[in-house]
């Protein structure tokens, strides 16, 4: 009986957290995220004009996937991201229920960036795979290689977090999610 109650309590605590998509009023990092982002500098599209200055600087980028290219021979995928800003507070459908909150980013793009990153198997294929409309937080460095379409340097991702379509919102949805 005690064992069963302990397992039930653990299950309830596990279910009440923000989960992998951060259902909370403010941004909640996942395991390993704080370490991955510790020395990262917030991305500014002006960095693409001076890649030499930022070649060894870890960059922190939030972006909505516009295009997903094919995988390279090393298992990395090529992504084009529309750069967004993270809001200080997430939008929620109910002030009393954090489970109705969704990570919120700007509805305006602050430029585009090309990224090469290795995805986990769960994010590479299947229902919630990274693709157009997904949101990613990328930590990476500017490479010495350049995007053949946009012309800018390619960001080589070292860490990422993924929100599939429908698991985040933009400021444009503030009229629907008022809390």
Task: Give a label for each model feature.
Residues 15-179:
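OB-fold and OB-like single-stranded nucleic-acid-recognition modules
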């Amino acid at each position: 009986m005690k064992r069963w109650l302990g397992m039930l309590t653990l299950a309830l605590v596990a279910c009440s957290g923000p989960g992998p998509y951060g259902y909370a009023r403010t941004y909640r990092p996942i395991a390993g995220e704080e370490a991955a982002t510790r020395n990262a500098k917030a991305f500014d599209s002006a960095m693409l004009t001076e890649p030499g200055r930022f070649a060894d600087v870890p960059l922190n980028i939030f972006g909505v996937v516009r295009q997903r290219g094919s995988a390279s021979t090393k298992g990395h995928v090529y992504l084009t991201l529309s750069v967004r800003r993270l809001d200080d507070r997430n939008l929620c459908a109910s002030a009393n229920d954090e489970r109705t909150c969704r990570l919120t980013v700007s509805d305006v793009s602050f430029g585009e960036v090309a990224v090469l990153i290795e995805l986990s198997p769960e994010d590479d294929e299947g229902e919630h795979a990274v693709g157009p409309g997904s949101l990613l937080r990328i930590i990476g460095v500017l490479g010495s290689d350049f995007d053949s379409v946009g012309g800018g340097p390619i960001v080589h991702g070292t860490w990422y977090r993924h929100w599939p379509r429908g698991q985040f919102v933009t400021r444009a949805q503030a009229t629907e999610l008022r809390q």
